């Protein structure tokens, strides 16, 4: 059995996927690389097949009709044979030295008395044109170099476990029944959220492993693109609220963390709807909150009357301008 399966969702990725694959090949035979061609119309399929032919014991090319990023991740999970599972997007890459430490740590932990559910590491925002590179690290929030549970997690505002920082135990993803929606962007938030109640122990390795590229005009996190795809963001937001509502929490620290994560996602949805500047968008914002209220009144009050929730719902045009201005300041300060 391979130690780590890595899925690379690819859609028309010919311009950058090779850099991603080459960075992952440094893992050698301990790693299984699943290149998922999600119905591409460029040379993505050809490149995937060429790598699979050259490295038959490491790389597997998977071809499917276009189903979106989530379905590509689903295909990766279905085909993974490794003990652990990670997603690396085709325009991103990993640091070689950190990669070696990740594999060494996973190997050592598999020989230990406990089965590890999730390994956490740092990621770096590789933002094009940025004066500094922001590192998302967790050294003041999580114990370092030891196995721990949710009671040891103390996340501050602005700190979240994103897809880029997470490696799950593969069987855990099967056990929790994770199935990401098709033809929907922003499902990485569901990937980093829904399985958490099944995670009983974690390990934090303080290395800058994942390099998260930001800068392509067509990238899903581009603000203008997000506004155009706001219905998909709202869909993910609602699915996260559903997951929270249906969860039977056995840790107050886990509940607090997941509530905080849902709070920031709801705020991002609100920001984009306000930035859209249309009455239709404002109606969608109201409808999203109403959906949560009908599903879970307790959750609605927690989100609507949090600090972020109050800011997102300041009355009138002036209130909306203040909200957007505050967002721009945070965006510049935090580097996202």
Predicted regions located by residue number:
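A conserved acidic beta->alpha catalytic loop
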Residues: 23, 37-46, 68
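Membrane-interface aromatic/basic loop that binds lipid-linked glycans or pyrophosphate carriers
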Residues: 275-336
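Short aromatic/hydrophobic "clamp" motif used to bind/position activated sugar donors
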Residues: 85
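Donor-binding/catalytic cores of nucleotide-activated saccharide
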Residues: 69, 92-202, 214, 218-226
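Nucleotide-sugar-dependent glycosyltransferase catalytic core
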Residues: 184, 201-236, 276-283
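Short, acidic, metal-binding catalytic loop of nucleotide-sugar glycosyltransferases
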Residues: 22-31
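Glycine-rich, basic loop-to-helix element that forms the pyrophosphate-binding segment
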Residues: 64-80
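Short beta-strand/loop segment that forms part of the nucleotide-sugar
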Residues: 30-39, 60-65, 89-90
């Amino acid at each position: 059995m391979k130690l780590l399966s890595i899925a690379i969702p690819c859609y028309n990725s010919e311009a950058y996927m090779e850099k991603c694959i080459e960075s992952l090949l440094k893992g050698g035979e301990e790693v299984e690389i699943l290149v998922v061609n999600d119905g591409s119309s460029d040379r993505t399929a050809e490149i995937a097949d060429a790598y699979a032919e050259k490295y038959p014991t490491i790389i597997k090319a998977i071809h499917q009709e276009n189903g979106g990023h989530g379905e590509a991740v689903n295909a990766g999970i279905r085909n993974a044979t490794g003990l652990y599972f990670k997603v690396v997007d085709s325009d991103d890459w990993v640091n070689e030295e950190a990669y070696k430490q990740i594999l060494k740590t996973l190997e050592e932990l598999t020989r230990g008395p406990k089965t590890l559910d999730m390994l956490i590491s740092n990621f770096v925002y590789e933002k094009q044109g940025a004066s500094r590179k922001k590192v998302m690290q967790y050294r003041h929030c999580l114990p370092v170099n030891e196995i721990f549970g949710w009671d040891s997690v103390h996340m501050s505002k602005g700190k979240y476990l994103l897809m880029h920082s997470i490696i799950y135990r593969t069987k855990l993803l099967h056990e929790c029944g994770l199935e990401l929606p098709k033809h929907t962007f922003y499902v990485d938030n569901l990937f980093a959220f829904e399985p958490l109640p099944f995670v009983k122990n974690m390990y934090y390795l303080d290395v800058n492993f994942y390099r998260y590229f930001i800068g392509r005009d067509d990238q899903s996190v581009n603000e203008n693109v997000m506004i155009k795809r706001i219905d998909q963001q709202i869909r993910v937001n609602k699915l996260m609220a559903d997951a929270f509502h249906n969860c039977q929490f056995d840790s107050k620290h886990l509940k607090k963390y997941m509530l905080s994560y849902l709070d920031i996602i709801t705020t991002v949805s609100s920001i984009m709807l306000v930035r859209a500047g249309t009455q239709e968008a404002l109606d969608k914002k109201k409808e999203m909150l109403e959906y949560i209220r009908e599903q879970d009144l307790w959750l609605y009050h927690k989100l609507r009357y949090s600090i972020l929730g109050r800011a997102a719902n300041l009355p009138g045009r002036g209130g909306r301008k203040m909200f957007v201005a505050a967002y721009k300041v945070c965006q510049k300060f935090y580097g996202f």
